[in-house]
């Protein structure tokens, strides 16, 4: 813990319920999972998964780390944390025989609070110029959602519809910090 740390608590990447991009994929029911493969790309999502498994579902599991791919092979009685674009793709796909657990939704159902996946933190208080740039960027981003959606579809090799991405950015992701975020 850094006592000089500063958190810009106006903005975050969070969800109040279903997030769709942070999921656990398994062929098994949650309580039958004995191995969890943690996505090597995310510390916050893996910690969320650990809390859900240990505190809410009270399961014992072996922890492993992996890099998710579209062609991964799923072991029986194992759960796989998947984030980001691939998580969105899996959330929209119909994978017969698989269960998809949305970690943001589980957290919200268990606690009643949003889950914060990312926030802006600094080792020292940022200048007013930095804060102004973030404020301006946030405002422009919210007003330019259609341009951002087109950009995402053009640069990413993502197999998700424009409508789904729009709903994800507008309804599933919460960008502004609230009192509930501190409590959660």
Task: Annotate each predicted stretch with a short phrase.
Residues 1-28, 48:
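Glycine/small-residue-rich interface belts in oligomeric ring/scaffold proteins
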Residues 7, 51-52, 95-97:
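Short, glycine/charged-enriched secondary-structure capping and boundary segments
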Residues 65-151:
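Pocket-lining segment of extracytoplasmic ligand-binding domains
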Residues 6, 60-62, 99:
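Conserved beta-strand segments of alpha/beta enzyme cores
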Residues 21-78, 183:
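Bilobed "Venus flytrap"/periplasmic-binding protein-like clamshell domains
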Residues 126-184:
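Secondary-structure end/capping motifs
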Residues 12-16, 27-29, 38-45, 112, ...:
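Short coil/turn segments
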